[in-house]
Amino acid sequence: MMPLLDEPPTIQAVLDRSALQSYARGHIHVGELLIDVADGGAVIAVPTVALMDAYAQSLGNKHATALLSLIITLPGIAVMDLDAKAASGAAKKVPWSKGDLSRSHAVWAAKAHNAYYLTTEPAEVVDLLPPGQIHVIPHEDA
């Protein structure tokens, strides 16, 4: 049997809204991780609800919205649509994420793909994911 040529890449990590906002502020941490993950042949997922939330938090900041528009075009990034399966799965996380739909979608994605959860707000997900799955992005730039 011939191997599939277009197998989907492995999702190694998921960016939440706070990690996307860190990138939109021009912090280097997310970009460095993106290079490492892409060099390994995997991708970092951007859940659409987290992306929408990051855009909403950046309204009026043209630089931040430009960086958000850029990151989703980069090699090594996979935008995760909110399809029926994701909506159903993410909805089950809403009660534990204090009603945060963006966080719920990102947590669901990390669990569904056994991927690292990249965040600047680890305290918000400490009860939702095992500690080894949470990767803290520094809130301040290096």
Predicted regions and their residues:
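Acidic catalytic patch
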Residues: T73-S97
